[in-house]
Design a protein with these regions (language model features):
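Short metal-coordination and nucleic-acid-contact micro-motifs, chiefly zinc-binding Cys/His arrays
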Residues: 67-69, 84, 102
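Long, charged N-terminal interaction/targeting segments
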Residues: 1-58, 63
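Short microdomains enriched in Cys/His and/or Lys/Arg
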Residues: 92-112
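Short cysteine-rich clusters marking metal-coordination/redox-active sites
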Residues: 72-73, 88-91
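Short, intrinsically disordered, charge-biased short linear motifs at domain edges
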Residues: 58-64, 72-79
Length: 112
């Protein structure tokens, strides 16, 4: 489970941002995780309490938004969800490029 290491890194980055901006408390942290990302949202949530223990984020609410995957057909340029359609729903081509769903981002930090 590499999510613990990832979450510790996020906590360090957010803590540094809080210090730079002279924040006393972080109320919420919003992450975006693409459904094709190797990061598993459930595991991030499970290790979050251990990662924030004793930090400025200890009382912070974690929110995780899962971003749907999207692909572009290389034959007709149709954008479609590759998890739901193994071929292009417009032309049945199997040639595609992934254009979304691999993201892993800190979307929002709310604090004061």
């Amino acid at each position: 489970m590499h999510e613990l290491g990832i979450m510790i890194h996020i906590v360090e980055k957010v803590s540094a941002l809080a210090e730079q901006n002279k924040l006393q408390e972080i109320q919420s942290l919003v992450l975006q995780v693409g459904e094709l990302s190797p990061v598993v949202p459930h595991f991030l949530e499970a290790c979050y309490p251990a990662a924030v223990d004793g930090t400025i984020l200890e009382k912070t609410e974690l929110k995780i938004e899962v971003l749907k995957a999207s692909a572009r057909c290389l034959q007709c340029d149709t954008i479609y969800p590759p998890v739901e359609h193994k071929t292009c729903p417009n032309c049945n081509s199997k040639e595609l490029t992934i254009v979304g769903g691999r993201e892993f981002l800190i979307k929002e930090i709310i604090g004061y």
